[in-house]
C-alpha cells in the first residue's frame, strides 16, 4: 500500500509539473515574437516591436528574488546593473526588455501593480512586461531570475546565461559576459562565450 501511495504521489507530481522546454540553443529563433506582452505602462508590445536594429536583450526578472534585488549586506543583486545595461543596449541599437514570468505570484508580489511600483522605486529605464502563464519563459526554457537571452538582428539566440560572474558586488566582477556579448554582437564579431550558467531564484510557475 505504501509503495502504491508513493507511486501515485510521484505520478501526481509529474502530471502537475509545468511544461518546460529545454533551454534554447544558440542560433535558434526567438519564440512568440508577435505575442502581446502587457507592460507596466499599460501598453502591450511584442518582442518584434521591442527589437533594435542590432538585436534584442531579454532578461527574465522579478520583484523579490535576492539575486535580482539584493539581500541586506549579503549581496547587492544584479538589478542595480540593469540601467547600465539599458544604456549600453541603446548605444548599440539593441532593444531591451525585462520579463516577469512569476505566474504563481501574480496575485501578490509579482502582480502588475507591484511590478509598476517596483520599477518606479528601482528607477527602471527599460520596458517591464508580464509573461502571462509563464508562456515565454517556458518556450525559451528560462529557469531563473535573472536569466539572460540575447538575440541578434534576426532574433536568433546569440548569448544565454548570466549577466556577469559576481552577483554580490559590481566592483568585484571579473567576467562581464553580457556586456562583451552585446558589444561583439553590435560589431558583427563572433561572441567568444555564448553560454554561461544562469544563477538565481527559480521562476515561480503555476503547478
What is each model feature region?
Residues 1-5:
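Positively charged n-region of N-terminal signal peptides that target proteins for export
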Residues 7-16:
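Bacterial N-terminal signal peptides
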Residues 52-56, 90-96, 123-127, 145, ...:
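Loop/turn elements at helix/coil->beta-strand transitions in domains of secreted/extracellular proteins
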Residues 46-75, 182:
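Short active-site neighborhood of thiol/selenol oxidoreductases, capturing the structured segment around
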Residues 20-48, 77:
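N-terminal "domain-start" segment that seeds a small globular fold
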Residues 150-207:
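Thiol-/selenol-based redox modules, centered on thioredoxin-like
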